[in-house]
Regions:
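Catalytic and substrate-binding clefts that recognize carbohydrates or anionic sugar/phosphate headgroups
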Residues: 1-120
Length: 120
């Protein structure tokens, strides 16, 4: 099932080509006072995605910046690589939901995936 959530006045990026009506409430994620979104990660939760980003296939335990940059020196110390693919697949752990999140935003997107807090 695909659900669409719209915040503010988004730019038409045409990255979603099928008409999907906006849903009312955002499942799984919690809106934080600072404008960010969070998800409670179980100890065995795994987070996949983000395209060309440093580190291994499980993105948990690090912070990332989705920003298309033409930087030739790639390494573990970089927060962002060339391609920004704002799609996450979150396996919540034993007995919890598996779901995906696609962020359709043309600017920088900052991710803290269990880096500051291992459980968020």
């Amino acid at each position: 099932m695909i659900q669409r959530f719209t915040f503010g006045c988004p730019l038409p990026t045409e990255s979603v080509v099928l008409p999907v009506e906006p849903a009312a409430a955002v499942p799984y994620l919690t809106a934080e006072p600072d404008g960010s979104w969070s998800f409670s990660l179980a100890e065995d939760a795994v987070v996949y995605g983000l395209g060309e980003m440093p580190r291994g296939i499980n993105k948990r335990g690090w912070h990332y910046v989705a920003d298309n940059t033409d930087e030739s020196r790639h390494g573990e110390n970089r927060l962002s690589y060339y391609g920004a693919h704002n799609f996450l697949l979150i396996d919540g752990g034993a007995g919890r939901s598996v779901f995906g999140v696609f962020v359709d935003f043309p600017g920088k997107v900052f991710y803290d995936i269990g880096y500051t807090r291992h459980d968020r």
